[in-house]
Protein backbone atom coordinates (compact mmCIF):
# COMPACT_ATOMS: atom_id res chain seq x y z
CA UNK A 1 0.00 0.00 0.00
CA UNK A 2 1.22 3.49 -0.87
CA UNK A 3 1.86 5.65 2.19
CA UNK A 4 -0.35 8.72 2.53
CA UNK A 5 0.99 12.25 2.31
CA UNK A 6 1.04 14.90 5.03
CA UNK A 7 -0.32 18.37 4.22
CA UNK A 8 0.54 21.32 6.44
CA UNK A 9 -1.82 24.27 6.08
CA UNK A 10 -1.22 27.64 7.71
CA UNK A 11 -2.86 31.05 7.58
CA UNK A 12 -3.37 34.13 9.72
CA UNK A 13 -6.44 34.11 11.93
CA UNK A 14 -9.39 35.27 9.82
CA UNK A 15 -8.12 33.97 6.47
CA UNK A 16 -10.65 31.12 6.35
CA UNK A 17 -8.25 28.20 6.81
CA UNK A 18 -10.51 26.08 9.01
CA UNK A 19 -13.51 26.49 6.69
CA UNK A 20 -11.41 25.55 3.66
CA UNK A 21 -9.92 22.48 5.33
CA UNK A 22 -13.35 21.33 6.53
CA UNK A 23 -14.75 21.68 3.01
CA UNK A 24 -11.70 19.92 1.52
CA UNK A 25 -12.11 16.91 3.80
CA UNK A 26 -15.92 16.73 3.73
CA UNK A 27 -16.97 13.56 1.93
CA UNK A 28 -13.34 12.65 1.20
CA UNK A 29 -12.58 9.38 3.04
CA UNK A 30 -9.00 9.46 1.73
CA UNK A 31 -8.33 12.73 3.60
CA UNK A 32 -8.25 13.12 7.38
CA UNK A 33 -7.72 16.17 9.57
CA UNK A 34 -5.18 15.37 12.27
CA UNK A 35 -6.62 15.84 15.77
CA UNK A 36 -4.30 17.73 18.12
CA UNK A 37 -3.64 17.23 21.83
CA UNK A 38 -4.28 20.11 24.21
CA UNK A 39 -4.26 20.87 27.92
CA UNK A 40 -6.99 23.50 27.68
CA UNK A 41 -10.37 22.64 29.23
CA UNK A 42 -12.93 20.94 27.04
CA UNK A 43 -15.66 23.36 25.93
CA UNK A 44 -19.38 22.58 25.69
CA UNK A 45 -20.14 20.68 22.50
CA UNK A 46 -16.56 19.57 21.90
CA UNK A 47 -15.96 15.86 21.33
CA UNK A 48 -12.72 14.20 22.50
CA UNK A 49 -10.94 12.66 19.53
CA UNK A 50 -12.87 14.82 17.11
CA UNK A 51 -12.08 18.38 18.17
CA UNK A 52 -9.03 17.66 20.35
CA UNK A 53 -7.51 14.98 22.51
CA UNK A 54 -7.84 16.54 25.96
CA UNK A 55 -5.03 15.71 28.40
CA UNK A 56 -3.71 17.30 31.58
CA UNK A 57 -0.45 19.24 31.80
CA UNK A 58 1.47 16.36 33.40
CA UNK A 59 0.49 13.97 30.61
CA UNK A 60 1.37 16.51 27.92
CA UNK A 61 4.78 17.23 29.44
CA UNK A 62 5.42 13.49 29.71
CA UNK A 63 4.71 13.23 25.97
CA UNK A 64 7.16 16.09 25.33
CA UNK A 65 9.84 14.28 27.35
CA UNK A 66 9.18 11.11 25.33
CA UNK A 67 9.49 13.07 22.05
CA UNK A 68 5.96 12.03 21.15
CA UNK A 69 5.10 15.22 19.23
CA UNK A 70 5.71 16.23 15.64
CA UNK A 71 5.19 19.79 16.83
CA UNK A 72 3.90 21.54 19.92
CA UNK A 73 3.61 25.01 21.38
CA UNK A 74 2.51 26.71 24.55
CA UNK A 75 -0.15 29.36 23.96
CA UNK A 76 -0.73 31.47 27.05
CA UNK A 77 -1.30 28.85 29.78
CA UNK A 78 -2.14 25.88 27.55
CA UNK A 79 -0.19 23.42 25.43
CA UNK A 80 -1.20 22.37 21.91
CA UNK A 81 0.55 19.68 19.90
CA UNK A 82 0.38 17.07 17.14
CA UNK A 83 1.32 13.56 18.23
CA UNK A 84 3.52 11.57 15.85
CA UNK A 85 1.35 8.48 16.24
CA UNK A 86 -1.81 10.40 15.30
CA UNK A 87 -0.32 11.31 11.91
CA UNK A 88 1.56 8.05 11.34
CA UNK A 89 -1.57 5.95 11.89
CA UNK A 90 -3.46 7.91 9.22
CA UNK A 91 -0.61 7.81 6.70
CA UNK A 92 -0.09 4.07 7.21
CA UNK A 93 -3.63 3.42 5.93
CA UNK A 94 -2.81 5.17 2.65
CA UNK A 95 -4.91 8.21 3.49
CA UNK A 96 -3.55 11.74 3.44
CA UNK A 97 -3.42 13.73 6.69
CA UNK A 98 -4.02 17.47 7.04
CA UNK A 99 -2.50 19.60 9.80
CA UNK A 100 -3.78 23.10 10.56
CA UNK A 101 -0.88 24.75 12.36
CA UNK A 102 1.02 28.03 12.48
CA UNK A 103 4.37 28.74 10.84
CA UNK A 104 6.35 27.70 13.91
CA UNK A 105 4.61 24.32 14.03
CA UNK A 106 5.06 23.95 10.27
CA UNK A 107 8.79 24.53 10.64
CA UNK A 108 9.00 21.80 13.32
CA UNK A 109 7.05 19.37 11.12
CA UNK A 110 9.28 20.00 8.08
CA UNK A 111 12.36 19.07 10.11
CA UNK A 112 10.87 15.69 11.05
CA UNK A 113 8.86 15.00 7.87
CA UNK A 114 10.56 16.86 5.00
CA UNK A 115 8.33 15.14 2.42
CA UNK A 116 5.26 17.00 3.70
CA UNK A 117 3.48 19.45 1.39
CA UNK A 118 2.82 22.90 2.82
CA UNK A 119 0.19 25.46 1.83
CA UNK A 120 -0.19 29.03 3.06
CA UNK A 121 -3.55 30.79 2.75
CA UNK A 122 -3.64 34.56 2.41
CA UNK A 123 -6.59 36.95 2.80
CA UNK A 124 -7.44 39.09 -0.28
CA UNK A 125 -6.32 42.30 1.42
CA UNK A 126 -5.25 43.76 4.73
CA UNK A 127 -8.59 45.57 4.97
CA UNK A 128 -10.54 42.35 4.38
CA UNK A 129 -8.53 40.58 7.08
CA UNK A 130 -9.20 43.33 9.61
CA UNK A 131 -12.90 43.25 8.74
CA UNK A 132 -13.03 39.49 9.27
CA UNK A 133 -11.32 39.83 12.64
CA UNK A 134 -13.82 42.49 13.67
CA UNK A 135 -16.76 40.37 12.53
CA UNK A 136 -15.55 37.30 14.40
CA UNK A 137 -14.73 38.93 17.72
CA UNK A 138 -16.42 41.40 20.05
CA UNK A 139 -13.07 42.80 21.08
CA UNK A 140 -11.62 46.17 21.95
CA UNK A 141 -9.52 48.12 19.46
CA UNK A 142 -6.40 47.17 21.41
CA UNK A 143 -7.19 43.45 21.12
CA UNK A 144 -7.99 43.76 17.41
CA UNK A 145 -4.69 45.60 16.90
CA UNK A 146 -2.82 42.76 18.62
CA UNK A 147 -4.61 40.20 16.45
CA UNK A 148 -3.65 42.14 13.33
CA UNK A 149 -0.04 42.32 14.50
CA UNK A 150 -0.03 38.54 15.05
CA UNK A 151 -1.60 38.00 11.62
CA UNK A 152 1.04 40.13 9.90
CA UNK A 153 3.78 38.22 11.72
CA UNK A 154 2.26 34.91 10.55
CA UNK A 155 1.98 36.11 6.94
CA UNK A 156 5.63 37.20 6.88
CA UNK A 157 6.58 33.49 6.72
CA UNK A 158 4.65 32.72 3.52
CA UNK A 159 7.85 32.08 1.53
CA UNK A 160 8.63 29.00 3.64
CA UNK A 161 5.68 27.15 2.05
CA UNK A 162 5.31 25.17 -1.17
CA UNK A 163 2.01 26.71 -2.30
CA UNK A 164 0.18 30.02 -1.86
CA UNK A 165 -3.61 30.46 -2.10
CA UNK A 166 -5.56 33.71 -1.78
CA UNK A 167 -8.96 33.15 -0.17
CA UNK A 168 -11.02 35.87 -1.84
CA UNK A 169 -13.55 33.65 -3.62
CA UNK A 170 -14.11 30.66 -1.30
CA UNK A 171 -15.04 28.16 -4.05
CA UNK A 172 -12.05 29.17 -6.16
CA UNK A 173 -9.70 28.81 -3.17
CA UNK A 174 -11.23 25.41 -2.35
CA UNK A 175 -10.77 24.20 -5.93
CA UNK A 176 -7.16 25.37 -5.86
CA UNK A 177 -6.59 23.45 -2.63
CA UNK A 178 -8.17 20.35 -4.19
CA UNK A 179 -5.96 20.79 -7.26
CA UNK A 180 -2.85 20.73 -5.06
CA UNK A 181 -3.97 17.46 -3.46
CA UNK A 182 -4.80 15.92 -6.85
CA UNK A 183 -1.49 17.01 -8.35
CA UNK A 184 0.45 15.39 -5.50
CA UNK A 185 -1.44 12.13 -6.04
CA UNK A 186 -0.38 12.02 -9.70
CA UNK A 187 3.38 12.14 -9.12
CA UNK A 188 5.38 9.16 -10.40
CA UNK A 189 6.42 8.36 -6.83
CA UNK A 190 2.80 7.88 -5.75
CA UNK A 191 1.35 6.51 -8.99
CA UNK A 192 3.98 3.88 -9.81
CA UNK A 193 3.17 1.56 -6.86
CA UNK A 194 -0.56 1.77 -7.65
CA UNK A 195 -0.02 1.12 -11.35
CA UNK A 196 2.62 -1.58 -10.93
CA UNK A 197 0.67 -4.30 -12.74
CA UNK A 198 -0.32 -2.02 -15.61
CA UNK A 199 3.24 -0.80 -16.07
CA UNK A 200 4.61 -4.36 -15.95
CA UNK A 201 2.07 -5.46 -18.56
CA UNK A 202 2.78 -2.49 -20.81
CA UNK A 203 6.53 -3.01 -20.65
CA UNK A 204 6.42 -6.81 -20.71
Curated annotation (Swiss-Prot):
One of its GO terms (molecular function) is ATP binding. InterPro entries: GK/Ca_channel_bsu, Guanylate_kin-like_dom, Guanylate_kinase, Guanylate_kinase_CS, P-loop_NTPase. It is an enzyme of class 2 (transferase). One of its GO terms (cellular component) is cytosol. It comes from the Bacteria. It holds the Pfam family Guanylate_kin. SMART domains: GuKc. PROSITE patterns: GUANYLATE_KINASE_1, GUANYLATE_KINASE_2. Its EC number is 2.7.4.8. SUPFAM superfamilies: P-loop containing nucleoside triphosphate hydrolases (SSF52540). CDD domains: GMPK. It catalyses: GMP + ATP = GDP + ADP. ATP binds at residues 11-18. The keyword Lipoprotein does not apply. Keywords: ATP-binding, Cytoplasm, Kinase, Nucleotide-binding, Transferase. Essential for recycling GMP and indirectly, cGMP. Belongs to the guanylate kinase family. This is Guanylate kinase. It comes from Methylococcus capsulatus (strain ATCC 33009 / NCIMB 11132 / Bath). The lineage of its organism: Bacteria, Pseudomonadati, Pseudomonadota, Gammaproteobacteria, Methylococcales.
Amino acid sequence: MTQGLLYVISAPSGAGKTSLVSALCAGAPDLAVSVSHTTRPQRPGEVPGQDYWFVDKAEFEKMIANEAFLEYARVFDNYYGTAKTTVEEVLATGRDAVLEIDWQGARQVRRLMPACVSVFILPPSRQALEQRLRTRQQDSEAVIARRMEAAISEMSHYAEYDYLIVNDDFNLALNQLRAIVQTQRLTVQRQAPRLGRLIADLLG
